[in-house]
């Protein structure tokens, strides 16, 4: 929350059939609340009729992005807040009006945690990535069902194409699964084609692809999830968002261990798989991994985790700089170091 004082503090509890609108002003702690039918046009008129500066808050839901896009031009600021943090809403009786009243109190007190939203061109990329991941999950489920069916009929489970089965019902189910898997593969090719188009259009994706272990799909996922690297104050916040560090719990001068933050599982998967792909290659991530194992005595899993953090930091740096990662600089340094060492040995 910023330090700006607004004339109107507005909270909305939006549902399919109704919306509760609570409002406070900078001069009064009195809350006015109304509960009316859900209508975004009427809501825009309501906001337009309020004179002075306005800040609006609503909770992160499936319609939050749509409301953000529709209302952003009618207020000075919109805050999409994290409902997980709003524990106050769980106390006492619960109605839409009560929820809106509590939400506007949290807004005015500056106690809300904002969820990042934007109305730019990256919205299309985010929706495309979301659809792709849903498709992959559905495809994995279909292939697992096919494998389970074949194994239940005494087969290996890895057979391709049509397989002769004794039971007629099994043959029918197998043919249905084969058709669905074929459709899944075609849809997957369509998504990859769109990803290649996006890579040609957006330099941010090409910059991410220049990193070791980051291929096309993961580069698109990074850009779709991060959108703007400048929303992270430092690398520590980004590593926490990516789930690559744990947060320490200290009270009374005593440590009570560490806990995982609430993080993006998508980003964590991208950097973890990226490190696995980079290890064994001629790149700085593999150099760092080998250094940790040979010089620092790290276990392999700890070295992989540290390398994943290094890859995430490089990814954030590339995003902020707007430039392609250049491993040639590293090779030049290694060559100079090798030449220097050889010269020292000759002198000795």
Predicted regions and their residues:
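Phosphate- and other anionic-substrate recognition elements at nucleic-acid/protein interfaces
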Residues: 1-165, 280, 296, 302
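Phosphate-backbone recognition surface of nucleic-acid-processing proteins
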Residues: 210, 216, 221-300
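Low-complexity, acidic/Ser/Thr- and charged residue-rich accessory regions of DNA metabolism proteins
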Residues: 252-253, 257, 289-348
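Glycine-rich, often acidic, oxyanion-interacting loops/wings at catalytic, nucleic-acid
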Residues: 129-207
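Short helix-capping/linker segments at secondary-structure and domain boundaries
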Residues: 110-113, 142, 228-231, 278-284, ...
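Non-catalytic, well-ordered alpha-helical scaffold segments
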Residues: 65, 98-101, 122, 126-129, ...
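Amphipathic alpha-helical segments in well-ordered regions
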Residues: 70, 149, 270, 274, ...
């Amino acid at each position: 929350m910023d330090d700006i004082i607004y004339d109107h503090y507005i909270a909305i509890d939006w549902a399919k059939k109704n919306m509760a609108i609570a409002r406070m002003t900078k001069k009064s702690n009195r809350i006015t609340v109304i509960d009316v039918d859900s209508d975004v046009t009427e809501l825009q008129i309501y906001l337009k009729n309020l004179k002075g500066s306005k800040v609006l808050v609503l909770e992160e839901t499936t319609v939050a992005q749509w409301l953000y896009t529709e209302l952003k031009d009618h207020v000075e600021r919109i805050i999409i807040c994290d409902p997980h943090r709003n524990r106050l809403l769980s106390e006492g009786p619960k109605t839409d009006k009560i929820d809106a009243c509590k939400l506007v109190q949290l807004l005015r007190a500056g106690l809300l945690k904002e969820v990042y939203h934007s109305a730019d061109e990256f919205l299309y990329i985010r929706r495309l990535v979301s659809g792709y991941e849903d498709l992959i999950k559905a495809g994995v489920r279909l292939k697992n069902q096919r494998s389970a069916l074949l194994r239940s009929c005494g087969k290996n489970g890895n057979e391709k194409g049509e397989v002769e089965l004794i039971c007629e019902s099994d043959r029918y189910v197998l043919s249905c699964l084969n058709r669905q898997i074929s459709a899944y593969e075609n849809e997957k090719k369509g998504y990859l084609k769109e990803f290649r188009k996006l890579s040609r259009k957006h330099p941010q994706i090409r910059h991410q692809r220049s990193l070791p272990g980051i291929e096309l799909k993961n580069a698109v996922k990074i850009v779709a999830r991060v959108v703007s690297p400048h929303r992270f104050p430092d690398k520590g916040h980004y590593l926490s968002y990516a789930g690559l560090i744990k947060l320490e719990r200290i009270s009374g001068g005593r440590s009570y261990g560490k806990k995982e933050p609430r993080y993006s599982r998508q980003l964590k998967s991208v950097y973890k798989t990226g490190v696995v792909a980079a290890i064994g290659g001629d790149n700085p991530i593999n150099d760092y991994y080998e250094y940790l194992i040979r010089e620092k005595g790290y276990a392999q899993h700890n070295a992989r985790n540290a390398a994943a953090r290094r890859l995430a930091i490089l990814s954030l740096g590339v995003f902020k700089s707007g430039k392609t990662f250049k491993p040639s600089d590293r090779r030049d340094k290694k060559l100079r170091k090798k030449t220097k060492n050889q010269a020292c040995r000759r002198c000795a």
